A protein has these predicted regions:
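Membrane-interface "cap" regions at the ends of multi-pass membrane proteins
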Residues: 1-47, 60-65, 76-77, 235, ...
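Helix-loop-helix junctions that connect adjacent transmembrane segments
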Residues: 3-11, 50, 126-144, 170-297
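Membrane-water interface regions at transmembrane-helix termini and the short interhelical loops
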Residues: 11, 71, 95, 149-172, ...
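Transmembrane helix-loop junctions in multi-pass membrane proteins
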Residues: 33-40, 157-163, 192, 328, ...
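Hydrophobic transmembrane alpha-helices that form the core helical bundles
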Residues: 39-42, 51-52, 61-151, 156-159, ...
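TM-loop-TM module centered on a large, flexible mid-protein loop between adjacent transmembrane helices
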Residues: 82-85, 89, 121-126, 244-309, ...
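Membrane-interface loop-to-helix entry segments
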Residues: 142-190, 202-205, 245, 249, ...
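A generic transmembrane alpha-helix motif of multi-pass inner-membrane proteins
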Residues: 370-372, 387-388, 393-444
Length: 444
């Protein structure tokens, strides 16, 4: 909130349960099911990938429970920053918040780049006017312009008011679900169970494990619900936060399981893992028509819009919160007097997204791996804070389960020798983010 000589200026209170679900689920499920389906299946096979997402997602339910309890007690946009500040030092509180900002923010330029790639797939003429190459990958002017245009649109929406942003999120989230049901329902009528083979690409344990490693990245978002906690309507019932968080996780698990099963069912997936946008290709092969590809790509674009917007909302609220608490420059805690939005934080996220777009997907894709660890750090810290607060014994047990899950998800990515562990690029990206955070903290 912001004080002036006449009144207290707070964030606008206009969000309902359906808005929080659209935010949580919409922030979680992006376009990975189209862009990197080949990677998921090569990691685990059809059954390995389904089990990886199902088990990994189920392990997030205790963490979702803890978030539901914390936001009910502390409906603060600071989220993990506020929770850890209750029981830990300001340094730990800031470090946790800074990691969570990375988890949300890194998705924004990734999605901005992805929309250009999808547009280029639909209209090949857009794969032209190469500006430069990074790590051997071209950066095209039309792709940049499309991504910058979308970034500008979402910046304006979020600057202008949370109700505009929430309406956009609802339409894109439920539109994604409707089109998803359409293409899956039609496509599977043409498939065969014989196409599932092989069920695992490695041993069953390794297959499931390799997929579970990436679950934190592809299921980050349910906790974005708490970042909008201060913007609930005055009549909002506090239990609505818990419902939205759990619904987001459960629907997310079902979405990933269904789309993986559908891709494995409709065509012999093993023969098509080299194809760009494999999900669209397998459905086109099964149906024998391009119309289903257009439906899938439209679904992906809507999904991209919602996950971009959801992460934009969450990142800007956290940046606003650390500014309001004086952990970085306090000007970031400014609330627009008319729009009642964290306007300066919104502008910073928009500008940073636009700048990072110029790195291209060659840099952004490996850097995005850091987001999964950043998310797990936030989950671990939130559960540890809840445990330290001292709830009843059974709730402390759930919190400890959340701590263990968060810790294991971190270790799966950073311990050398474990398949899929951090490369030098990921460590470099994480180190740079830490340096930026320390610089902002020391100059606050």
């Amino acid at each position: 909130m912001l004080y002036n000589s006449r009144r207290v200026i707070t964030l606008a209170r206009k969000l309902r349960v359906v808005d929080y679900f659209a935010l949580g689920w919409g922030t979680m499920v992006g376009v990975g099911w189209l862009v990197v389906m080949d990677d998921w299946l090569l990691r685990g096979g059809v059954l390995g990938a389904i089990l990886g997402f199902a088990i990994g997602g189920a392990l997030l339910l205790p963490i979702g429970y803890v978030y539901g309890q914390l936001v009910a007690a502390m409906p603060d946009a600071a989220g993990e920053i506020a929770y850890t500040a209750r029981v830990f030092s300001r340094a730990i509180s800031f470090a946790t918040g800074w990691m969570m900002i990375l988890a949300y923010f890194i998705v924004c330029p990734w999605e901005a780049v992805a929309v250009g790639k999808i547009a280029g797939y639909i209209f090949p003429a857009l794969d032209s006017i190469e500006l430069y190459r990074i790590a051997g990958q071209p950066v095209y002017l039309p792709h940049l312009l499309i991504g910058l245009g979308l970034t500008g649109l979402l910046t304006v929406l979020n600057y202008s008011g949370i109700r505009l942003s929430a309406t956009f999120q609802n339409w894109t989230a439920f539109g994604t679900l409707a089109l998803f049901a359409l293409f899956v329902g039609f496509g599977v009528s043409k498939g065969s169970p014989r196409n599932f083979s092989p069920l695992f690409t490695h041993s069953p344990f390794v297959s499931v494990f390799l997929v579970m490693q990436i679950v934190p990245y592809f299921m980050t978002g349910f906790e974005s619900v708490v970042k909008g906690a201060e913007e609930a309507t005055p009549e909002f019932r506090i239990r609505g936060f818990f419902k939205a968080i759990w619904m987001a996780i459960v629907v997310g698990i079902l979405f990933y399981a269904v789309v993986i099963a559908a891709v494995g069912y409709v065509a012999p997936w093993k023969q098509l893992t080299h194809e760009k946008f494999m999900t669209a290709v397998v459905f086109e092969r099964a149906v024998g028509s391009r119309w289903i590809v257009r439906v899938i790509l439209t679904t992906a674009i809507l999904s991209l819009f919602k996950v971009f917007n959801g992460n934009f909302v969450a990142a800007s609220r956290l940046l606003f919160a650390i500014g309001r608490r004086g952990l970085v420059d306090q000007r970031l805690g400014h609330v627009h007097p008319r729009n009642q939005t964290p306007s300066l934080a919104v502008l910073c996220i928009g500008l940073a997204t636009a700048a990072c777009m110029f790195l291209g997907d060659a840099i952004l894709v490996p850097v995005s791996e850091v987001g999964s660890v950043a998310s797990a750090i936030g989950w671990l810290a939130a559960c540890a804070a809840y445990y330290r607060i001292g709830p009843p014994r059974h709730k402390r047990f759930i919190a400890m389960v959340g701590v263990i899950v968060g810790l294991l998800m971190i270790l799966m990515k950073i311990v050398p020798g474990i398949p899929g562990h951090f490369s030098a690029y990921e460590w470099l990206a994480l180190g740079m983010w830490v340096v930026i955070g320390l610089s902002l903290r020391l100059t606050a």
